Amino acid sequence: LDFDGDAVMAGTPKGVDDENFFYQACNDKSMGWEEHHAPTAANPTINPAALARIIDGRPPLVVQQEYNAEFVDWRGQNFFKLDWLLENGAPVDYPFSCDTVYGVVDCAQKGKLQNDGSACIWFALDNLPSPHLVILDWDIIQIDGYFLKDVVPQWEGKAKHLSEICRARMGPTGLFIEDKATGITLLQQGANEGWNVHPVNSELTSLPKESRAINISGYVASGKVRISKYAFDKIVEYKQSKKNHLLTQVLQFIIGEENQDDDLFDCFNYGVALGLGNGEGF
């Protein structure tokens, strides 16, 4: 700018945020920025029919932000809907057969009531006739991270047991664990002890929760993720509250709201991304 030059700033809108400089530049004309609005449909190299297939089934607000390049006010919006997880308005039976069963683990460091818990969700993946998931079971506990070394083998055993029930053609894939904090220790111990455990891609775990939710929204909204009757009806006491914590955390997640219980929510996001994404969760 000292040489009378120009500056270009480009990005995808991310919510309505008066403190965000990109939002200010696009909406406060007194700042002097000239706006170039480029929704995906304006790209001449993209086939309109292909774009229609891409956005089909995605939540309207996701389409508005990610594809129409508009600023969306997410405040107060429950992101996931119960109907998306049901088939004809009801949870589903365990699959008669599937390709594999795997679990996804979110680890806590401390076991006090005010701290996060440790959680696991087990999924069945079937690629026929097209890739889809069934949530088989879930668990959430309040325990110090040190003692997870005794719990993880039990959760791995459950993945094996569920793979037998669901006649998994490729057997169990094991457990996917966040590669950070307590998870690093568990992955190292698992390698030494021969556990069937794998790290969740660090690029995926480093994304904000909102970005991870948007990342899987198309799969969930289009009916590629179903919840089993067992997981739907399950009630567990956790933090002095007895209820279905999986449904509560997933369905009551609100973008932009702080201090939400998210142990099972994280497992849900990672599990869907790993099962239906590109292998690295995207």
Q: Where is each model-derived feature located?
A:
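A short acidic (Asp/Glu
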Residues: 19-21, 114-115, 184-191
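Gly/Thr-rich phosphate-binding beta-strand-loop-beta motif of the actin/hexokinase/Hsp70
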Residues: 96-126, 267
